[in-house]
Curated annotation (Swiss-Prot):
UniProt name for this protein: Periplasmic alpha-amylase
GO biological process: one example: oligosaccharide catabolic process
Assigned GO CC terms: outer membrane-bounded periplasmic space; periplasmic space
Job of this protein: Since only maltooligosaccharides up to a chain length of 6 glucose units are actively transported through the cytoplasmic membrane via the membrane-bound complex of three proteins, MalF, MalG, and MalK, longer maltooligosaccharides must first be degraded by the periplasmic alpha-amylase, the MalS protein.
Superkingdom: Bacteria
Naturally occurring in which organism (per UniProt): Escherichia coli (strain K12)
Gene: malS
Amino acid sequence: MKLAACFLTLLPGFAVAASWTSPGFPAFSEQGTGTFVSHAQLPKGTRPLTLNFDQQCWQPADAIKLNQMLSLQPCSNTPPQWRLFRDGEYTLQIDTRSGTPTLMISIQNAAEPVASLVRECPKWDGLPLTVDVSATFPEGAAVRDYYSQQIAIVKNGQIMLQPAATSNGLLLLERAETDTSAPFDWHNATVYFVLTDRFENGDPSNDQSYGRHKDGMAEIGTFHGGDLRGLTNKLDYLQQLGVNALWISAPFEQIHGWVGGGTKGDFPHYAYHGYYTQDWTNLDANMGNEADLRTLVDSAHQRGIRILFDVVMNHTGYATLADMQEYQFGALYLSGDEVKKSLGERWSDWKPAAGQTWHSFNDYINFSDKTGWDKWWGKNWIRTDIGDYDNPGFDDLTMSLAFLPDIKTESTTASGLPVFYKNKMDTHAKAIDGYTPRDYLTHWLSQWVRDYGIDGFRVDTAKHVELPAWQQLKTEASAALREWKKANPDKALDDKPFWMTGEAWGHGVMQSDYYRHGFDAMINFDYQEQAAKAVDCLAQMDTTWQQMAEKLQGFNVLSYLSSHDTRLFREGGDKAAELLLLAPGAVQIFYGDESSRPFGPTGSDPLQGTRSDMNWQDVSGKSAASVAHWQKISQFRARHPAIGAGKQTTLLLKQGYGFVREHGDDKVLVVWAGQQ
């Protein structure tokens, strides 16, 4: 989850005119939005480590380690000591995209760990390719190009094939006797991420649940109608796309109303994305009902597709007029007839008048009224600057991210249920003696696994919750999935355990502490820009792919090109397919990557444009060729675990760029002919 744009103006301006500095390092240079880098030659020894930005001093919050993501906090009296074990060129990289800065320290190795065999981008004249396959396929073997379905017989260690006209010069080579997809492996997963509300409307009757409605403008932050039934309707499409895991936005009940959207408050922002949860025991009515969810999960499993829920344990949603009125918490500055006159019969129908914005509803709310706000979540559940609640802290674990109420997941005090649940008659939450907020959250979330056979979670804002909480979630969800599979042997896809991946801004291909606390993979934030540098020459991915294939023999990452929190990757047209789908490790397609879904309206929040409606009209229209290209490469990936899980050997070819990936008995050879 990215920070809500309506609050960005209140955060430190990490990405503006001021520059980061650190003693002993030259001024940092910006490398992409929100990331800053500086290099320095340093001697072996011990030195203090502090960083400065706009007269604010920052220091690592934890022990200083190389190649680890370190959270930064305001400086205390004693700066931490950094022990340098050898002379070398050190790099400091600061990432501010999550709203709180993080630091990564690395050192230049004496020799490159992996040297690319590609010196310049190969050129191709469009003629058939003669490929030496002697080290991959035996003499006399029948080798198939999966893309074109051509078959060639290995003769004198070589084959000759013509890349298909629509393949961008690719040959996807496998043994011709390969006739089915291999058993599923999370290291080779192709995950399709959808914001359910923006994908497909399968049930228009639920579009205006809880009194939600359109804004009559650009509909930037309103609910658009996508739901669980719509997802089920498109499972055949996803299966044809080679998808074997579907990550859906959190389907739990969200705040019912809206908050002001964008820095200018120029649109109402509803929780269509699933990141402002209000009740983890209910489905949001806009998403559908429990029968819809069961049908989705069962139908997906029948097609070999796993279901992942997006989950949030760091924060709740904002207070909205709709929820204040319905659940009787909070306080207004208005009284008597003033309430109806200013807000109307139904408060959520309020609209800004001349001179007001969608932020202006806050002017009617008395955020200091202790009695009124005690009726909301309660002090045992959250910290926030509202009422008599404990104030948020300044570190990653206790801060109020984008001014969202921070859940006290670290608390060891029994909390009872959220206070306003007393007025929420439809909740399935039951009080459990001794339970803390963390206990309730992990119990509620794992219950969805136990009831429906959910295969995994994608964890939002992982760095803002203490690691033991994630381990607790993984342990409980894993037990729940085992129970479900035992009770539903006819529905279970296999005996694979519960899978969990997480979002920690700036995380790359490194085996961090998250992997020791329940996570099977972390989202790879580095891959988007690495791929952008290779859109004109696939061979330029060689070093990145070699390094990933080598490192990922011991762990896994989830790499992406586009996301709802960064940008849509539209460079190179359908070349994005091979850039993503041939990557080592698990990969994530963001809905519409395959069909070049257009950027949508944004107002004063540029991220909103990444969440546009799925362009179904283009799938069978102007983007049909692109979709077919994605399908072929993704289906090839699904047939071969070696692509995601295998070791890579780069080949020195007379023409083009090529590599072999090998995992167990599975072996493939991929050739890119070169630029035409």
